[in-house]
Regions:
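Thiamine diphosphate
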Residues: 3-129, 133-346
Length: 346
């Protein structure tokens, strides 16, 4: 059992070493444990970070960086390791493409964590061994960490393939953004208020599937005694596909899915499937704050895409954007009384 150490490594020690030794660009999907490092990167104009929509995509981006002569760094939570197994086994390991994987360890045995991390927490090291990806656990003292990074750098150069550095909770010290405005866009309708409005306009007849993160938590706080709610705690990006499967099996019941922009982007192909089969009873609501709020507020790429147009072009019967409580109320009432599928972008 690992005991969280009160001694932590300053994030500029890690980021500084990697920069001086030619590592970068960075890509990946954020985790709260990695927030300090991501904040450090955001404030360093010499380091580029590309926010990926999924871990598998991040490995593809990293492969391109490697082919371009760079030494990429891929950030991910261990829960996302499964999302990139194919890219690792059929791309990076086959073509011997180097990359430094910074993988956070959630669900470590003996440390309280959320239930969705329990199984992967126990199997992370077994999975890395199975994939024949060498790994080390990051040291929690400055001098030891520097020596470790030097050793790993030599191994990556010699082996020319991925190497994983696993980071436990409490290893990296905090690092706050001096200017957090770029990660905190302002909206006329908050997520919490939107969930209240949605809940108020539904009866007990509809089923609600809510995505992982703060959306499920806030829906639970809003109406935890409501029957017909399914609160996802993991499997990011799967809420709308769960809703689709349920809608197909229960055609006489309205199925509402509360999605987030990060989850929508992670498995955007789901929208094409839903549009193709066109379940008339499905209402897909995307609560978009352009950020991964539950992992520290890092930006997503949703700010430059039109979610409602994507849904419309994929075959949804109706799709639109709402900005105010009155617009959201009207959109919900219309969707409940007309055949779908419907897409509401909040």
């Amino acid at each position: 059992i690992h005991i969280i150490n009160s001694i932590m490594v300053a994030v500029d020690i890690i980021g500084g070493f990697l920069y001086k030794n030619g590592y970068g660009p960075y890509t990946g999907v954020p985790c709260s444990i990695l927030s300090p490092l991501i904040n450090y990167i955001i404030e360093n104009p010499k380091i580029k970070f590309y926010m990926a929509t999924s871990e598998g995509e991040a490995m593809g981006i990293a492969a391109g960086f490697t082919l371009g002569g760079r030494k990429p760094v891929v950030l991910m939570q261990n829960s996302g390791l499964g999302n990139c197994v194919n890219a690792l086994t059929s791309l990076h390991l086959i073509y011997r493409l180097k990359a430094l994987l910074l993988i956070t360890l959630r669900g470590e045995e003996g440390i309280p964590d959320e239930p969705q991390h329990q199984i992967m927490g126990k199997k992370t090291f077994d999975l890395l061994k199975c994939l024949e990806i060498p790994y080390e656990i990051m040291k929690d003292e400055k001098e030891k960490t520097i020596e470790q990074l030097k050793r790993i750098d030599k191994k990556i150069r010699a082996r020319s393939s991925p190497f994983a550095l696993v980071i436990r909770k409490g290893t990296i010290s905090n690092y706050n953004l001096k200017d957090s405005s770029q990660c905190s866009p302002k909206y006329p309708l908050s997520r919490r208020k939107a969930i209240k409005i949605i809940s108020f306009n539904l009866s007990n007849k509809e089923a609600i599937i809510s995505t992982t993160g703060k959306i499920s938590r806030e829906l639970f706080y809003e109406n935890k005694n409501r029957e017909g709610n399914f609160y996802m705690v993991g499997s990011m990006g799967c809420a709308n596909s769960i809703a689709f499967g349920l809608a197909e099996e229960k055609p006489d019941r309205k199925i509402i899915v509360l999605d987030g922009d990060g989850a929508f982007l992670m498995k955007m192909g789901n929208i094409a499937t839903i549009g193709f089969y066109s379940p008339a009873n499905l209402i897909h609501i995307v609560l978009d704050n352009e950020s991964h709020d539950s992992t520290g507020g890092q930006h997503t790429v949703s700010g430059r895409i039109n979610i409602s147009e994507i849904a419309g072009n994929c075959g949804f019967k109706s799709s639109g954007v709402v900005l105010t409580d009155l617009e959201l109320t009207a959109a919900i009432k219309r969707a409940l009384n007309e055949e779908g599928p419907h897409s509401i972008h909040v």
